[in-house]
Protein backbone atom coordinates (compact mmCIF):
# COMPACT_ATOMS: atom_id res chain seq x y z
CA UNK A 1 0.00 0.00 0.00
CA UNK A 2 1.05 3.59 -0.64
CA UNK A 3 1.25 6.48 1.83
CA UNK A 4 -0.25 9.27 -0.28
CA UNK A 5 0.36 13.00 0.09
CA UNK A 6 -2.08 15.85 0.54
CA UNK A 7 -2.30 16.56 -3.18
CA UNK A 8 -3.48 13.00 -3.80
CA UNK A 9 -6.21 13.33 -1.18
CA UNK A 10 -7.34 16.70 -2.51
CA UNK A 11 -7.53 15.03 -5.94
CA UNK A 12 -10.10 12.67 -4.41
CA UNK A 13 -11.93 15.68 -3.00
CA UNK A 14 -11.98 17.18 -6.49
CA UNK A 15 -13.93 14.13 -7.67
CA UNK A 16 -16.36 14.41 -4.74
CA UNK A 17 -16.80 18.19 -4.81
CA UNK A 18 -15.21 19.85 -7.86
CA UNK A 19 -13.81 23.32 -7.15
CA UNK A 20 -15.60 24.82 -10.13
CA UNK A 21 -18.96 24.23 -8.44
CA UNK A 22 -18.15 26.70 -5.66
CA UNK A 23 -20.00 30.00 -5.51
CA UNK A 24 -18.06 33.07 -6.60
CA UNK A 25 -15.74 34.40 -3.90
CA UNK A 26 -15.88 31.26 -1.75
CA UNK A 27 -12.33 30.73 -0.37
CA UNK A 28 -12.22 26.94 -0.73
CA UNK A 29 -9.16 24.71 -0.99
CA UNK A 30 -5.92 24.93 0.95
CA UNK A 31 -6.24 27.08 4.07
CA UNK A 32 -2.87 26.46 5.69
CA UNK A 33 -0.08 23.88 5.46
CA UNK A 34 1.83 21.77 2.95
CA UNK A 35 -0.06 19.47 0.58
CA UNK A 36 3.15 17.73 -0.51
CA UNK A 37 3.46 16.18 2.96
CA UNK A 38 2.72 12.46 3.37
CA UNK A 39 -0.64 11.84 5.04
CA UNK A 40 -1.23 8.98 7.46
CA UNK A 41 -4.31 10.31 9.24
CA UNK A 42 -7.16 12.50 7.94
CA UNK A 43 -9.81 14.13 10.13
CA UNK A 44 -13.12 15.56 8.90
CA UNK A 45 -14.82 18.48 10.63
CA UNK A 46 -17.57 21.01 10.00
CA UNK A 47 -15.60 23.92 11.48
CA UNK A 48 -11.95 24.55 12.26
CA UNK A 49 -11.79 25.91 15.81
CA UNK A 50 -8.93 25.87 18.31
CA UNK A 51 -10.62 22.94 20.09
CA UNK A 52 -10.68 21.00 16.82
CA UNK A 53 -7.00 21.77 16.22
CA UNK A 54 -6.16 20.56 19.75
CA UNK A 55 -8.05 17.34 18.98
CA UNK A 56 -6.07 16.95 15.74
CA UNK A 57 -2.78 17.45 17.60
CA UNK A 58 -3.75 14.89 20.24
CA UNK A 59 -4.75 12.34 17.60
CA UNK A 60 -1.68 13.01 15.41
CA UNK A 61 -3.69 14.11 12.39
CA UNK A 62 -1.81 15.17 9.25
CA UNK A 63 -4.70 16.60 7.22
CA UNK A 64 -7.92 18.28 8.32
CA UNK A 65 -10.69 18.44 5.72
CA UNK A 66 -13.33 20.97 6.77
CA UNK A 67 -16.60 22.18 5.33
CA UNK A 68 -16.31 25.78 6.48
CA UNK A 69 -13.15 27.71 5.49
CA UNK A 70 -11.73 29.32 8.63
CA UNK A 71 -9.95 31.97 6.54
CA UNK A 72 -13.27 33.14 5.14
CA UNK A 73 -12.53 36.85 5.25
CA UNK A 74 -9.24 38.36 3.99
CA UNK A 75 -6.58 38.36 6.72
CA UNK A 76 -4.14 41.28 6.73
CA UNK A 77 -2.11 40.04 9.67
CA UNK A 78 -1.91 37.08 12.05
CA UNK A 79 -1.80 38.03 15.72
CA UNK A 80 -0.82 34.90 17.64
CA UNK A 81 -2.34 36.31 20.85
CA UNK A 82 -5.86 36.01 19.35
CA UNK A 83 -7.84 32.77 19.31
CA UNK A 84 -7.52 32.40 15.54
CA UNK A 85 -3.85 33.40 15.60
CA UNK A 86 -3.11 30.79 18.29
CA UNK A 87 -4.88 28.20 16.18
CA UNK A 88 -2.86 29.02 13.06
CA UNK A 89 0.35 28.94 15.11
CA UNK A 90 -0.54 25.47 16.43
CA UNK A 91 -1.34 24.19 12.94
CA UNK A 92 2.01 25.37 11.58
CA UNK A 93 3.97 24.17 14.62
CA UNK A 94 2.47 20.67 14.40
CA UNK A 95 2.65 20.54 10.60
CA UNK A 96 -1.10 20.03 10.13
CA UNK A 97 -2.61 20.94 6.77
CA UNK A 98 -6.17 22.29 6.48
CA UNK A 99 -8.29 22.01 3.34
CA UNK A 100 -11.88 23.25 2.91
CA UNK A 101 -14.73 22.17 0.61
CA UNK A 102 -17.61 24.58 1.17
CA UNK A 103 -20.27 25.59 -1.38
CA UNK A 104 -18.81 23.10 -3.86
CA UNK A 105 -19.70 20.34 -1.37
CA UNK A 106 -23.13 21.91 -0.81
CA UNK A 107 -23.84 21.88 -4.55
CA UNK A 108 -22.22 18.59 -5.63
CA UNK A 109 -24.36 15.53 -6.28
CA UNK A 110 -24.24 13.42 -3.14
CA UNK A 111 -23.04 16.44 -1.14
CA UNK A 112 -24.43 18.20 1.91
CA UNK A 113 -27.91 18.98 0.58
CA UNK A 114 -28.39 15.50 -0.85
CA UNK A 115 -27.36 13.99 2.49
CA UNK A 116 -29.89 16.15 4.34
CA UNK A 117 -32.60 15.27 1.82
CA UNK A 118 -31.79 11.56 2.15
CA UNK A 119 -32.01 11.74 5.95
CA UNK A 120 -35.55 13.08 5.55
CA UNK A 121 -36.34 10.30 3.02
CA UNK A 122 -37.27 12.81 0.32
CA UNK A 123 -38.11 11.29 -3.05
CA UNK A 124 -37.69 12.59 -6.62
CA UNK A 125 -35.33 15.36 -5.52
CA UNK A 126 -34.27 18.21 -7.77
CA UNK A 127 -32.19 21.35 -7.18
CA UNK A 128 -33.71 24.61 -5.99
CA UNK A 129 -31.37 27.02 -7.80
CA UNK A 130 -29.28 26.00 -10.82
CA UNK A 131 -25.73 27.32 -10.42
CA UNK A 132 -23.61 25.37 -12.93
CA UNK A 133 -24.04 23.73 -16.34
CA UNK A 134 -21.74 22.05 -18.84
CA UNK A 135 -22.17 19.46 -21.62
CA UNK A 136 -22.21 15.74 -21.05
CA UNK A 137 -19.82 13.60 -23.07
CA UNK A 138 -19.97 9.95 -24.06
CA UNK A 139 -16.96 7.67 -24.14
CA UNK A 140 -16.76 4.50 -26.24
CA UNK A 141 -13.92 2.06 -25.58
CA UNK A 142 -13.15 -1.07 -27.61
CA UNK A 143 -11.68 -3.85 -25.49
CA UNK A 144 -11.09 -7.64 -25.66
CA UNK A 145 -13.89 -9.55 -23.96
CA UNK A 146 -11.66 -10.95 -21.21
CA UNK A 147 -10.50 -7.43 -20.21
CA UNK A 148 -13.95 -5.83 -20.16
CA UNK A 149 -14.35 -5.70 -16.36
CA UNK A 150 -11.07 -3.91 -15.67
CA UNK A 151 -11.94 -1.20 -18.21
CA UNK A 152 -15.51 -0.96 -16.91
CA UNK A 153 -14.19 -0.37 -13.39
CA UNK A 154 -11.79 2.27 -14.66
CA UNK A 155 -14.78 4.10 -16.13
CA UNK A 156 -17.23 3.89 -13.25
CA UNK A 157 -14.66 4.42 -10.49
CA UNK A 158 -13.66 7.71 -12.08
CA UNK A 159 -17.08 9.27 -12.52
CA UNK A 160 -18.48 7.80 -15.73
CA UNK A 161 -21.88 6.16 -15.88
CA UNK A 162 -23.81 8.29 -13.39
CA UNK A 163 -27.30 9.31 -14.52
CA UNK A 164 -29.06 11.63 -12.08
CA UNK A 165 -28.55 11.06 -8.36
CA UNK A 166 -30.02 7.56 -8.11
CA UNK A 167 -28.29 5.59 -10.89
CA UNK A 168 -24.58 4.81 -11.07
CA UNK A 169 -22.36 2.44 -13.10
CA UNK A 170 -24.64 2.83 -16.14
CA UNK A 171 -22.88 1.39 -19.21
CA UNK A 172 -23.88 -0.16 -22.55
CA UNK A 173 -22.02 -3.05 -24.19
CA UNK A 174 -22.07 -4.26 -27.79
CA UNK A 175 -19.96 -7.01 -29.33
CA UNK A 176 -18.16 -7.05 -32.64
CA UNK A 177 -14.91 -7.83 -34.39
CA UNK A 178 -11.89 -5.58 -33.97
CA UNK A 179 -9.16 -5.62 -36.63
CA UNK A 180 -5.66 -4.15 -36.51
CA UNK A 181 -2.22 -4.58 -38.07
CA UNK A 182 0.71 -3.78 -35.75
CA UNK A 183 3.68 -1.97 -37.29
CA UNK A 184 7.31 -3.05 -37.08
CA UNK A 185 7.95 -0.90 -34.00
CA UNK A 186 4.76 -1.92 -32.20
CA UNK A 187 4.58 -4.10 -29.10
CA UNK A 188 1.16 -5.75 -29.53
CA UNK A 189 -0.57 -7.51 -26.64
CA UNK A 190 -2.39 -9.70 -29.15
CA UNK A 191 -1.28 -10.67 -32.67
CA UNK A 192 1.99 -10.37 -34.58
CA UNK A 193 3.82 -7.45 -36.17
CA UNK A 194 2.98 -6.78 -39.80
CA UNK A 195 0.06 -9.24 -39.60
CA UNK A 196 -3.62 -8.34 -39.75
CA UNK A 197 -5.36 -9.57 -36.60
CA UNK A 198 -9.12 -9.84 -36.02
CA UNK A 199 -10.54 -10.69 -32.58
CA UNK A 200 -13.89 -10.48 -30.76
CA UNK A 201 -14.14 -7.19 -28.86
CA UNK A 202 -16.69 -5.38 -26.74
CA UNK A 203 -17.58 -1.74 -27.18
CA UNK A 204 -18.39 -0.24 -23.77
CA UNK A 205 -20.08 3.15 -23.60
CA UNK A 206 -20.86 5.52 -20.74
CA UNK A 207 -21.68 9.19 -20.24
CA UNK A 208 -19.85 11.64 -17.97
CA UNK A 209 -19.59 15.40 -17.30
CA UNK A 210 -17.15 17.08 -19.67
CA UNK A 211 -14.80 18.15 -16.88
CA UNK A 212 -13.91 14.50 -16.20
CA UNK A 213 -12.60 13.86 -19.73
CA UNK A 214 -8.90 13.84 -18.86
CA UNK A 215 -9.35 11.83 -15.65
CA UNK A 216 -11.45 9.14 -17.30
CA UNK A 217 -9.41 8.73 -20.49
CA UNK A 218 -6.21 8.50 -18.45
CA UNK A 219 -7.72 5.81 -16.20
CA UNK A 220 -8.96 3.82 -19.21
CA UNK A 221 -5.54 3.91 -20.89
CA UNK A 222 -3.94 2.56 -17.71
CA UNK A 223 -6.50 -0.25 -17.38
CA UNK A 224 -6.61 -1.17 -21.07
CA UNK A 225 -4.33 -4.02 -22.22
CA UNK A 226 -3.56 -2.50 -25.63
CA UNK A 227 -0.53 -0.36 -26.41
CA UNK A 228 -2.79 2.03 -28.37
CA UNK A 229 -6.40 1.55 -27.21
CA UNK A 230 -9.26 2.79 -29.40
CA UNK A 231 -11.13 5.42 -27.39
CA UNK A 232 -13.82 7.75 -28.76
CA UNK A 233 -15.05 10.78 -26.80
CA UNK A 234 -17.75 13.07 -28.13
CA UNK A 235 -20.01 15.81 -26.80
CA UNK A 236 -23.72 15.11 -26.43
CA UNK A 237 -26.04 17.78 -27.79
CA UNK A 238 -29.13 16.50 -25.99
CA UNK A 239 -27.87 16.17 -22.42
CA UNK A 240 -26.44 18.78 -20.07
CA UNK A 241 -24.70 18.24 -16.75
CA UNK A 242 -26.34 20.53 -14.19
CA UNK A 243 -25.61 21.25 -10.56
CA UNK A 244 -27.33 23.60 -8.17
CA UNK A 245 -27.93 24.71 -4.62
CA UNK A 246 -30.52 23.13 -2.35
CA UNK A 247 -32.87 20.22 -2.91
CA UNK A 248 -36.62 19.86 -3.16
CA UNK A 249 -38.45 16.55 -2.96
CA UNK A 250 -41.50 14.81 -1.58
CA UNK A 251 -42.23 12.71 1.47
CA UNK A 252 -43.76 9.26 0.88
CA UNK A 253 -47.05 10.61 2.28
CA UNK A 254 -48.52 13.85 3.59
CA UNK A 255 -48.05 14.40 7.34
CA UNK A 256 -48.76 17.19 9.81
CA UNK A 257 -46.22 19.97 10.31
CA UNK A 258 -45.76 19.00 13.95
CA UNK A 259 -45.07 15.37 13.00
CA UNK A 260 -42.63 16.50 10.33
CA UNK A 261 -40.73 18.70 12.77
CA UNK A 262 -40.41 15.74 15.14
CA UNK A 263 -39.17 13.60 12.25
CA UNK A 264 -36.65 16.28 11.28
CA UNK A 265 -35.27 16.64 14.81
CA UNK A 266 -34.73 12.89 14.97
CA UNK A 267 -33.14 12.73 11.52
CA UNK A 268 -30.71 15.58 12.22
CA UNK A 269 -30.10 14.66 15.89
CA UNK A 270 -31.14 18.08 17.20
CA UNK A 271 -33.35 19.05 20.12
CA UNK A 272 -34.78 22.38 18.98
CA UNK A 273 -35.73 24.32 15.86
CA UNK A 274 -37.18 27.77 15.15
CA UNK A 275 -40.36 27.88 13.08
CA UNK A 276 -42.04 30.53 10.94
CA UNK A 277 -45.59 29.96 9.71
CA UNK A 278 -48.64 27.83 10.46
CA UNK A 279 -47.98 24.82 12.70
CA UNK A 280 -51.39 23.42 11.74
CA UNK A 281 -50.37 23.00 8.09
CA UNK A 282 -49.64 19.66 6.42
CA UNK A 283 -46.41 18.74 4.64
CA UNK A 284 -45.48 16.60 1.66
CA UNK A 285 -43.23 18.69 -0.58
CA UNK A 286 -40.06 19.85 1.16
CA UNK A 287 -37.31 22.28 0.14
CA UNK A 288 -33.98 22.37 1.97
CA UNK A 289 -30.78 24.40 1.84
CA UNK A 290 -28.15 23.57 4.44
CA UNK A 291 -26.45 26.55 6.06
CA UNK A 292 -27.65 30.09 5.31
CA UNK A 293 -30.49 30.01 2.79
CA UNK A 294 -31.84 33.52 3.39
CA UNK A 295 -31.10 34.65 -0.18
CA UNK A 296 -33.09 31.82 -1.72
CA UNK A 297 -36.53 32.10 -0.10
CA UNK A 298 -38.25 33.13 -3.34
CA UNK A 299 -36.61 30.28 -5.26
CA UNK A 300 -37.78 27.88 -2.54
CA UNK A 301 -41.30 29.33 -2.74
CA UNK A 302 -41.30 28.87 -6.53
CA UNK A 303 -40.80 25.10 -6.11
CA UNK A 304 -44.25 24.82 -4.54
CA UNK A 305 -42.79 23.41 -1.33
CA UNK A 306 -45.04 23.08 1.72
CA UNK A 307 -42.09 23.89 3.98
CA UNK A 308 -38.57 25.28 3.61
CA UNK A 309 -35.70 24.11 5.82
CA UNK A 310 -32.53 26.14 6.28
CA UNK A 311 -30.43 27.81 8.98
CA UNK A 312 -29.57 31.29 10.25
CA UNK A 313 -32.95 32.82 9.35
CA UNK A 314 -32.79 36.58 9.93
CA UNK A 315 -35.55 38.48 11.75
CA UNK A 316 -36.58 40.50 8.69
CA UNK A 317 -36.32 37.44 6.45
CA UNK A 318 -38.79 35.71 8.78
CA UNK A 319 -41.26 38.53 8.15
CA UNK A 320 -40.69 38.10 4.40
CA UNK A 321 -41.40 34.38 4.76
CA UNK A 322 -44.70 35.15 6.47
CA UNK A 323 -45.54 37.61 3.70
CA UNK A 324 -45.02 35.03 0.93
CA UNK A 325 -46.67 32.28 2.99
CA UNK A 326 -43.69 29.90 3.04
CA UNK A 327 -43.59 27.94 6.31
CA UNK A 328 -39.94 27.64 7.30
CA UNK A 329 -37.96 25.58 9.78
CA UNK A 330 -34.68 27.07 10.97
CA UNK A 331 -32.83 23.89 11.92
CA UNK A 332 -29.53 25.69 12.51
CA UNK A 333 -26.33 25.89 10.52
CA UNK A 334 -24.81 23.03 12.48
CA UNK A 335 -26.96 20.35 10.78
CA UNK A 336 -24.32 20.42 8.04
CA UNK A 337 -22.18 18.29 10.39
CA UNK A 338 -23.63 15.31 8.50
CA UNK A 339 -20.83 15.89 5.95
CA UNK A 340 -18.23 14.49 8.36
CA UNK A 341 -19.34 10.87 8.20
CA UNK A 342 -20.18 11.13 4.50
CA UNK A 343 -16.70 12.37 3.56
CA UNK A 344 -15.05 9.79 5.80
CA UNK A 345 -16.90 6.98 4.03
CA UNK A 346 -16.23 8.38 0.54
CA UNK A 347 -12.55 8.90 1.28
CA UNK A 348 -12.15 5.40 2.72
CA UNK A 349 -13.83 3.97 -0.38
CA UNK A 350 -11.57 5.86 -2.79
CA UNK A 351 -8.41 5.20 -0.75
CA UNK A 352 -9.16 1.47 -0.87
CA UNK A 353 -9.53 1.60 -4.67
CA UNK A 354 -6.25 3.53 -4.99
CA UNK A 355 -4.47 1.34 -2.42
CA UNK A 356 -3.67 4.30 -0.14
CA UNK A 357 -2.72 3.54 3.45
CA UNK A 358 -4.23 5.97 5.97
CA UNK A 359 -6.66 6.27 8.87
CA UNK A 360 -9.80 8.39 8.49
CA UNK A 361 -11.63 9.83 11.49
CA UNK A 362 -14.34 12.41 12.23
CA UNK A 363 -13.90 15.19 14.75
CA UNK A 364 -15.74 14.59 18.01
CA UNK A 365 -15.82 18.29 18.91
CA UNK A 366 -19.27 19.90 18.92
CA UNK A 367 -18.73 23.18 17.07
CA UNK A 368 -22.30 24.49 17.43
CA UNK A 369 -21.96 27.84 19.26
CA UNK A 370 -25.60 27.95 20.35
CA UNK A 371 -27.17 26.70 23.57
CA UNK A 372 -30.89 26.68 24.31
CA UNK A 373 -31.80 27.77 27.82
Swiss-Prot record:
Keyword Metal-binding among record annotations: yes
Gene3D superfamilies from the UniProt entry: 3.30.70.120, NIF3 (NGG1p interacting factor 3)-like (3.40.1390.30)
GO cellular-component term (any): cytoplasm
MF-aspect GO terms: metal ion binding
Entry keyword set: Metal-binding
Pfam families assigned: DUF34_NIF3
InterPro entries: DUF34/NIF3 (IPR002678), DUF34/NIF3_bac (IPR017221), DUF34/NIF3_sf (IPR036069), N-reg_PII/ATP_PRibTrfase_C (IPR015867)
List of residues binding a divalent metal cation 2: 68, 333, 336
Record: residues binding a divalent metal cation 1: 67, 106, 336
Listed SUPFAM superfamilies: NIF3 (NGG1p interacting factor 3)-like
Similarity field: Belongs to the GTP cyclohydrolase I type 2/NIF3 family.
Subunit text: Homohexamer.
Protein name: GTP cyclohydrolase 1 type 2 homolog
Amino acid sequence: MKVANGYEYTAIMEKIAPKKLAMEGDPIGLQVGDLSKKVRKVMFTLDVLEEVVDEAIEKRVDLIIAHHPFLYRPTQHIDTTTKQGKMIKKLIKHDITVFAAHTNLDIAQGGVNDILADLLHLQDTTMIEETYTEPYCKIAVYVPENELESVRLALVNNGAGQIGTNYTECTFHTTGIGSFKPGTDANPTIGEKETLTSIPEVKIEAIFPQYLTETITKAVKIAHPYEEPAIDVYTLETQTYKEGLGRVGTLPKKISMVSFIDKLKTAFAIDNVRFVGDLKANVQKVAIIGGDGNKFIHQAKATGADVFITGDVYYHTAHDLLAINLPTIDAGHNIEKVMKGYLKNKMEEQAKILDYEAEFIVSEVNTDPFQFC
